[in-house]
Amino acid sequence: MEESRGQLPSRVTIYEVAAEAGVSISTVSLALNTPARVSIRTRQRVLDAVDALGYTPKTEAVAQARKGVGRIGVLAPYTSYPSVARRLTGVLRAVGDKPVEVVVFDQESSAKSASPLLASLPLTGRLDGLIIMSIPLEESVAGRLLGLGLPAVLVDVRHPDFDSVHTDDVTGGRLVAEHLVERGHRRFGFLGESQQ
């Protein structure tokens, strides 16, 4: 990609990504938009090309032009688990009226899959940081995030290379039980979210 003095740098195109990855443009599109329709190996080749070239999809070009606005991505199974939706609400409240755009990516239940959506996101230039809630982080995805230098925080999952925030379910359960026993209750019921 060449840059002339006084001119904006040319934008990387999907054609260049396809050439770099050695695939067709339709394969690039599938790998980025419906990753389940391509093999893991092909998807990884496309993502490597996206990262190497700094490709930003056209729909994100306008967002790239924003001035003074940060962009945080939140990847979470929020439609699968009400508790995750409440955490997402907490993130939105914390951002408040700060000049930060929050982009939410809904991930199917983490009980069904690890992070295929995260593995397929074209991250270059799109986000300033990422919050990953309740989704195990595959090593290939962790390596990609580290390679891009994209700051990421995990919620309710652990990975040695990333900061994380956790609820202490054991202590919480013990405190609830102690509270109920102190009030004379002896038979308990539990209502929770199904892990589907």
Q: Where does each model-flagged region fall?
A:
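Short beta->alpha connector loops of Rossmann-like oxidoreductase domains
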Residues: 57, 134, 195
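Alpha-helical recognition/docking segments in bacterial nutrient-uptake
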Residues: 2-9, 67-178, 182
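Short beta-strands and strand-loop turn motifs
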Residues: 27-31, 74, 154-157, 188-192
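N-terminal helix-turn-helix DNA-binding module of bacterial transcription factors
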Residues: 1-69
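An alpha-beta-alpha
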Residues: 176-196
